[in-house]
Amino acid sequence: MQRKLIEIERRYDELTQLLSDPEVIGNQSEWQKYAKAQAGMTDIVEAFREYSEVVKHLEETQGLLEEKLDPEFKEMAELELEELTEKRDELEEKMRILLLPKDPNDDKNVIMEIRAGAGGEEAALFAGDLYRMYTKYAEQQGWRTELLSASYTDIGGFKEIIFLIEGQGAYSKLKFESGVHRVQRVPTTESGGRIHTSTTTVAVLPEAEEVDVAINPNDLRIDIFCSSGPGGQSVNTTQSAVRITHVPTGTVVSCQDEKSQLKNKEKALRVLRARLLERAQEEAMGELASERRSQVGTGDRSERIRTYNFPQGRVTDHRIGLTLHRLDSILLGELDEVINALITTDQAERLKSEA
C-alpha cells in the first residue's frame, strides 16, 4: 500500500505543476482534464500526508520512551503514544477505503423510478410517500430534482413516478435504494382498523450521457398521443405526450408531464438512455454478480430491502439488520443514518474481498 500511495502523491505533485504551466492554462480542455484528475486524488493524498506526519511523531514518541524520563513526563508520553497509535490505525483504514476501486457511476446524476406493487391504492399512496422522502433528502443534500414522468391514481397516489436527481455524488449515495420497499399500516380507506402490507418497487439508475449509450434513431418508434390525468381524464387536447419504443430491446418509455411535445421527447430519451445503460451494465456484470453477492444487495428490483412499519414507528433495513424507531423523520428525508450504514457495510465487504 505504501508504494502505491507514494506513486499517487508523486502524480498529484506533477499535476499541481502542470496546472500552473502557462501552456496548459492556455488549453482549457487540457487544464480541466488535469484539474479533474488532481481533484480525484486530493482526499487520498491529504490522508497520506497526515498519516506520514502521525507516523513521524509516533516514532519520536517511542524514541523518547526509551530514554530515562521522570514519571510525570513518561505518563504524558505514553498517553500521546496511545493517541497517535489510534490515529495511525484510523488513517490506515481510511486510506484502504479510499484506495478501493471506484464505481464509475458514483459521480453521475440519478434517474429514480418508483412503482406501486402489491396493495392497490395503498401501494400507490406509499409510492407518493417515497417520492416525497427522496425529494426532501435531495433538497437537504443541495441537489436538484426534476419530474420526468408520472402516472397518477384517483386518490392522489402514483402507479409510477420517474424523476431526476441532479447533484454531486447522487448515485453513490442512492444506489443502494433499489429494491422492494414494504409498508405496514392501516389504510385510510380501512374502516376495521386492520394493518395492511403493501409493496412499492424502487429502481435507481445512473443517468446516461449520450456518449455512454449510442442510440440509432432508426431503432426508435415514436408515438404521439394526448396526455391524460387521474382516472384517465384528458388533460390536454393537443397531442403532446410521447411514447418511445427501442425496438431491438423492446424498452418502452412514455412521458406526458410537459405541455411541449419536444420537452416530453427529451425527457423520455433521458429515461431510455438510463435504462439501456443499466441493461448493458447488467449483462457485463452478470458473471461477476453470480460470483459475489453483496450483503448490501444486488440492486435487484425484486429484492425486499426495507420495511416501514407505521404502528410501531419503525424502519428496518433487512440487508444489514438495521432498525430505527424514527419513521416520521426518515419519511421527511432524514436518511443519512440509513444510507451511511449501507455505504459503510459495502466498503467493509469490499475491503474483505480485496484482502
From Swiss-Prot:
Alphabetized UniProt keyword annotations: Cytoplasm, Methylation, Protein biosynthesis
Gene Ontology MF term list: translation release factor activity, codon specific
InterPro entries documented for this protein: PCRF (IPR005139), Pep_chain_release_fac_I (IPR000352), Pep_chain_release_fac_I_sf (IPR045853), Prokaryotic/Mito_RF (IPR050057), RF-1 (IPR004373)
Main subcellular location: cytoplasm
SMART domains, A to Z: PCRF
A GO CC annotation given for this chain: cytoplasm
Modified residues (N5-methylglutamine): 233
Subcellular location: Cytoplasm
Keyword tRNA-binding: no
Pfam families linked: PCRF (PF03462), RF-1 (PF00472)
Origin: domain of life: Bacteria
Post-translational modification: Methylated by PrmC. Methylation increases the termination efficiency of RF1.
Family: Belongs to the prokaryotic/mitochondrial release factor family.
Function according to Swiss-Prot or TrEMBL: Peptide chain release factor 1 directs the termination of translation in response to the peptide chain termination codons UAG and UAA.
HAMAP family according to UniProt: Rel_fac_1
Protein name according to UniProt: Peptide chain release factor 1
Gene name as annotated: prfA
